[in-house]
Amino acid sequence: MRNLFYILIIFILLGCSVDKNSEVGINPLPNFDAMWDYQHPDSTEIIFIEILEGLKNSAESSYDAEYHAELLTQIARTQGLQSKFIQAHATLDSVKSMLNDNMKTAFMRYLLERGRVFNYSGEWEISKPLFLRAYEFGVENKLDIYTLDAAHMMGIVEPPDKQLDWNLKALKIAEETSDENCKGWLGPLYNNIGWILQGLTEYDQALVYFQKGYEWRTEVGDENGARIAKWTVGRCLRSLKQNEEALKIQKEIQAVIEEKNLPDDGYVFEELAELYLLNGNMELAKKNFTLAYEELSKDRWIVKNQQDRLRRLKKLGDK
């Protein structure tokens, strides 16, 4: 479950960059937020450093100090995602030395990225006050897109009993703001809230949010996201012991994967296996446990964090 949570966080990142001026727009300076590739922070860092070099060589009349500071916060983020934590903090130290009272957005982004680097390095307790300060500052200054981000990060670093409240705060901003940049968070937040409720065994409520997430992904034309969101609906139905409907959904997903010649999905195989096991179809259960093991054993996060899960899949596939 935790891994699916982080997969959807990637969807948040991919879908929620701040579109200040489109690719370039009115401002002659490049919109670096539109150039983010969160799955490839190394190549993104190279692009951002090239922009930085161009900024250093630009005419004094076109220099924008806040833009410079914001760009550096995102360079630090690329470094943090690559586990270059010392370098990331050094980059953020440079930002801190540039800030003044007029740079509200840059200060907000500095807080967020300093917190994220601490969180990436496992020092989440240090990150928490930074995210909280960012949230409060964002509320005070009506910086909705970054306030939402801060609430979302608080929902990650807080203990489980507080995660739901923070995600609901983030969702409230996304639903009520006039900032269209925030709307891309709706689907991922529906997903996150669904998983939190699933973890609290509030399955009926979890299903409501998973269905909202599926509907949102479908409405915006996100086929891959909709397929994953549909999977969460099926997974929740299994928790509600609605196994026939859950199996129907997972078989539909598998049929689409095969029809479109998409990569095999270990999560779908795993869910099919569990459902076949529940209805006593041991032959299909064994087949899908084997397929699930083959795919999920390639997932570095699962290999590192969920060895018991892999051992169970292998054992049930070998029977």
Predicted segments, located by residue:
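Conserved alpha-helical positions within TPR/SEL1-like repeat arrays
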Residues: 36, 70-81, 109-120, 146-160, ...
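Amphipathic alpha-helical segments of tetratricopeptide repeats
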Residues: 52-57, 93-100, 132-139, 169-179, ...
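N-terminal leader/linker segments that initiate helical-solenoid repeat arrays
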Residues: 19-74
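Structural signature of alpha-solenoid helical repeat scaffolds
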Residues: 63, 102, 142, 178-181, ...
